Amino acid sequence: MNFTVPVQAIQSIWSVGKESDDAIAEACKPPFCIYFSKKTPYTVTNGSNADHGDDEVRQMMRGLLYNSSCISAQGHTPLALYSTAMLYPPMYGSCPQYVKLFDGSGSESVDVISSSYFVATWVLLVVVIILVFIIISFCISN
């Protein structure tokens, strides 16, 4: 299994007085890149200024210090990116598995074909084993 951790990118937005573009958002596409975008307008508070990020940007950057793309309510684990048990929205970031399973608006979809083949293979194996036991018991009883 390949557990390649995607690149993480944060929206490079300036204050109202400076021009911003969305080049990073256009370049960063899942599953190889996870893009964190601001949800509120740029605000200068708590001693920050127009050039060094507002509170929301600082919070997003703080999350990167954990080397994690998402932190769930259960805490951070290195495999949080790939957890299929992600039932709650992340407290920070955007967990790809959560987005794929529960967000119908995205272009990403869950790869159910490979997992279906895996389940079908095991079911077939169990059926074959049961049939072998039935045949053996039939032969022994005769």
From Swiss-Prot:
The chain crosses the membrane at residues 118-138. GO terms for biological process: fusion of virus membrane with host plasma membrane. GO terms for molecular function: host cell surface receptor binding; hydrolase activity, acting on ester bonds. Pfam families: Hema_esterase. Homodimer. The truncated hemagglutinin-esterase of Berne virus is probably non-functional, since part of its active site is missing. This is Truncated non-functional hemagglutinin-esterase homolog. It comes from Berne virus (BEV).
